[in-house]
Amino acid sequence: MDLTASAAIVLSAAGRTGHEAIIERAGAIVSPDLLEDAAEAIAAPWVSTGGGLLTPGCSGWPRGLADLGPAEPCALWVRGTPSVELSRMVAIVGSRRCTPYGRDCARILAETVVGTGRAVVSGGASGIDAAAHHGALAAGGATVLYAAGGAGTVYPENHRGLYHAAQASGAVVWEFPPGSALSGRSFLHRNRLLAASSGA
């Protein structure tokens, strides 16, 4: 037996070719029931502690995420007020190392946005993001914090109070399930959701 043979050669030798053969074989290895059981095992603790799980097409799903096409997430892990309309948001994002003037501008802009009845969405980072969240909160409006990493991750750690305030006024949203590692790429994934959900 040639252990260096390609997958196409192996499938061809078995009398099958093309994508259908690969899908059929994958289905035999991982059954839909097994995947469903695994998903329920991950989601159950989250939901039992007050977390929510949104999927495309359900109430509250940000409409703009459909513009991502195949990169649209399959679920969003949420903590916060269920009444927040996640499809009526304006994104305010910027530098972590901003000037006091930039911080003031972000805060004032956020106050203006919530005055129009929309929620402010940002990424919870230091600098402009935090100023935007705080501006929305100070004006009595809703803010939605798109967080990087797995559901429940707070980064930076000293923003735990901001996460709780965002959760109380609006929502904190993660793309990945609890336990997913936080890495540099996590922020890129998060940023595409910020842009798409606000129609940027």
Give, region by region, the residue ranges found by the protein language model.
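Glycine-biased, small-residue-rich flexible motifs in mid-sequence functional cores and linkers
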Residues: 1-3, 53-200
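Short, small/acidic-rich helices and loops at N termini and domain boundaries
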Residues: 1-62
